[in-house]
Amino acid sequence: MKHQHYGTMEVIRQCAVPGTMVKYNDRMYKATANTRGKLTLTNIRENITIRDLVIEIYLDGKGEPLTN
């Protein structure tokens, strides 16, 4: 795993800003764009677009979203 994290939290898709680390299908992705009801996620291997209403984000030591 690339970053140290302190748990996860489920939030609505609109709360993910670019750079937020997201857990999706048991993999870590970085949110890159949140437009037109779609969230674009990327990692070193793939880029995907999701329309899920609720997503799971990683938290840092202060309980805030982990950003890169």
Segments predicted by a language model, with ranges:
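Intrinsically disordered, low-complexity, charged/polar segments
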Residues: 2-6, 48-68
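Basic/aromatic-rich interaction segments and small domains that mediate binding to polyanionic partners
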Residues: 28-53, 57
